[in-house]
């Protein structure tokens, strides 16, 4: 009879292996080594490495989604909750870049508009937009666009915190810099609509008459 505890141990070992070696270099052997079990045990619990990886990523992202959803569902202040969510994503993707990259693999590497992290973020953004658009007096689509920018910026800089350091001289390994970025993003999120529309119209005219 299959032991659920052993199965869970193998999934956790898969997550560790992905984080250490990357999704491309994670093998049945690296997972078995991380779990401290016999190589043959893995085939008893899972049909393939692909199944293990898929379930492990679903577990990791599911846990993150539960935390994000809790921030939003238990909020007493919309902006404070959104700040917590963005910092959680920023810190989490920095702490677990391998798993974050792997969970975005379908979107980043294959160009597919789907994937577990992608789907999670879509659900969270949708809930935030529905909850804040009327209160913030910002059109639904404009708020959604701004949130996409904020979520993308935190994820990309979390995965690769020094990617833009040569140009910006900002290292996002330093938490103070991560906090500053999130606060800057939030400040721009609720930029007055009239000002945003004026800027957009000016840019559109420049495109028409270069």
What is the role of each PLM region?
Residues 9, 13, 17-51, 55:
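Helix-turn-helix
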Residues 13, 17, 88, 153-157:
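Amphipathic alpha-helical interface segments
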Residues 55, 69-95, 140, 146-150:
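Hydrophobic alpha-helical connector segments
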Residues 58-63:
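Short, basic, alpha-helical segments at the C-terminal edge of helix-turn-helix-like DNA-binding modules
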Residues 64-70, 111-137, 145-148, 160, ...:
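Amphipathic alpha-helical packing segments from all-alpha helical-bundle domains
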Residues 86-89, 103-107, 150, 154, ...:
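Short alpha-helical scaffolding segments that buttress acidic/His motifs in well-ordered protein cores
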Residues 93-115, 160-166:
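Amphipathic alpha-helical segments used for helix-helix packing
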Residues 126-134, 153, 159-210:
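C-terminal peripheral helix-coil segments that are non-catalytic and often amphipathic
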């Amino acid at each position: 009879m299959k032991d659920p505890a052993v199965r869970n141990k193998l999934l956790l070992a898969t997550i560790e292996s992905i984080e250490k070696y990357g999704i491309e270099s994670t093998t049945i052997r690296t997972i078995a080594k991380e779990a401290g079990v016999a190589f043959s045990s893995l085939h008893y619990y899972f049909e393939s490495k692909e199944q293990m990886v898929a379930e492990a990523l679903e577990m990791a992202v599911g846990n993150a989604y539960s935390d994000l959803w809790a921030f939003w569902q238990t909020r007493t202040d919309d902006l404070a909750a959104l700040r917590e969510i963005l910092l959680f994503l920023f810190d989490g993707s920095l702490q677990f870049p391998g798993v974050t990259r792997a969970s975005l693999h379908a979107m980043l590497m294959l160009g597919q508009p789907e994937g577990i992290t992608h789907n999670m973020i879509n659900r969270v953004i949708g809930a935030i937009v529905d909850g804040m658009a009327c209160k913030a007096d910002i059109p639904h689509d404009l708020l959604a666009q701004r949130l996409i920018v904020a979520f993308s910026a935190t994820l990309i800089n979390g995965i690769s915190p020094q990617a833009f350091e040569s140009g910006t001289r900002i290292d996002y390994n330093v938490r103070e810099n991560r906090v500053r970025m999130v606060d800057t993003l939030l400040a721009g999120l609720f930029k007055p609509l009239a000002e945003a529309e004026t800027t957009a119209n000016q840019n559109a005219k420049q495109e028409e008459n270069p």
